[in-house]
Amino acid sequence: MTKYIFVTGGVVSSLGKGITASSLGRLLKNRGLNVTIQKFDPYINVDPGTMSPYQHGEVFVTDDGAETDLDLGHYERFIDINLNKYSNVTTGKIYSTVLKKERRGDYLGGTVQVIPHITNEIKDRVFRAGKETHADVVITEIGGTVGDIESLPFLEAIRQIKSDVGRDNVMYIHCTLVPYLKAAGEMKTKPTQHSVKELRSLGIQPNVIVVRTEMPISQDMKDKIALFCDIDPKAVIEAGDADTLYSIPLDLQKQGLDSLVCSHLKLDCREADMEEWKELVKKVKNLSKTVTIALVGKYVELPDAYISVVESLRHAGYAFDADIQVKWINAEEVTEDNVADLVQNADGILVPGGFGDRGVEGKITTVKYAREQKIPFFGICLGMQVASIEYARNVLGLEGAHSAEIDPSTPYPIIDLLPEQKDIEDLGGTLRLGLYPCKLQEGSKAYQAYENEVVYERHRHRYEFNNEFRQQMEEAGFVFSGTSPDGRLVEIIELKDHPWFVASQFHPEFTSRPTRPQALFRDFVHASLKTSEKL
């Protein structure tokens, strides 16, 4: 029978529930179990697709095209699994489904209420996640903080699940904070006690408490937490600050978290073999080289907006024993006069995805500098589009060339709406989303990277290269090295007479793994290292 683990958070947000859940998932997978994982977000948006990155950080896209919380990126990278649309559920999605059922008459004229209709729909999403993936264990992270009004239906639903499937098949893990008061020189357990009290008032008794702390906690303090929260002292797990996120699974294993879980859920499985993971952590902590990548974007004040890009760069760096230093550059501040100073000492330049006109001219200026100065360049999504616009303007001489998204009246719409997007009015969930095939041109840098004729990558875009300009650009030396199998859509562009200048319409950052870097990121970092004469 499928087992269910629920991870909740208390005291404050951003305690690392997602990393805790991901790390546990990795440990259980390495015990030979089939694990899936999901995130419940209490906000009323249907998904984060239309939310500002400043509000929510990166939007992570799954193979089946779901626009999801950035925690799913952590889940995929840690556990090395591909998730689906059932892995991220929001209040908005739940209510939308229930209201559609009510309009269809599915409730036979009954009064639709939070209990049982909303809670039943939430429970259905938990059970469906396990059924769709044939999982031995489903890990569900509940977003927000215990005590928030928005989280109550989710907490009630996971309380009911224990009755539905039996206490031996459900486990509750609560993440809390033990703050250190510098003035008093003391750590305080009272916030944790009150958070657990709040959780218990809702009918949920945690089986494990993961204590987030910046200072080591004593056994006496663990015993105190265990006494007041009514759990075994061995079930108080310390989660201190880590040098690298990837060491956290090993820290949790050392404290026996996975053994506690297997014992409680009566899972008969082998010990987790973490030797490969230990080698990864050893490598990460002992990198001997450094490469600097200038990341030119519009949301650089919030690095979480590009978290998968940065992690993918790091994964690529690990393959070459290199520590990646990201130089954050606000695209709005880039001009012809200062671009050289801004990207000074950068071994490579990366322009990531984005929407809207803010910072676009700065990105175009950056691309021009990378092209002319022969600096390794990697463009992603909008990064590919601005690379195409820059070439049209400055090599073909098409003055005023632009994207129809930014300048609808441009005489040369190098980037235009996808044909199927012409009559769409809604912004949410209407992009070209998810995994699509890309056919590569033999002999190209893209082909060298993938060593494959057809590859599959995840997309999130509405605009595409305009084929009216394809022949003209090709004749001027622009290489279309990746297209959809029918040749209709441009997926990858590159330049011949350049050390490494490649840009993709898709988002390769969503498929990178710490032990298996994504091919284009790997070759971009390799080219950056070679250029800096560090390899």
Swiss-Prot record:
It comes from Bacillus licheniformis (strain ATCC 14580 / DSM 13 / JCM 2505 / CCUG 7422 / NBRC 12200 / NCIMB 9375 / NCTC 10341 / NRRL NRS-1264 / Gibson 46). Its EC number is 6.3.4.2. Residues 292-534 form the Glutamine amidotransferase type-1 domain. Catalyzes the ATP-dependent amination of UTP to CTP with either L-glutamine or ammonia as the source of nitrogen. Regulates intracellular CTP levels through interactions with the four ribonucleotide triphosphates. The active site is at C381 (nucleophile), H507, E509. The keyword Nucleus does not apply. Transmembrane segments: none annotated. This is CTP synthase.
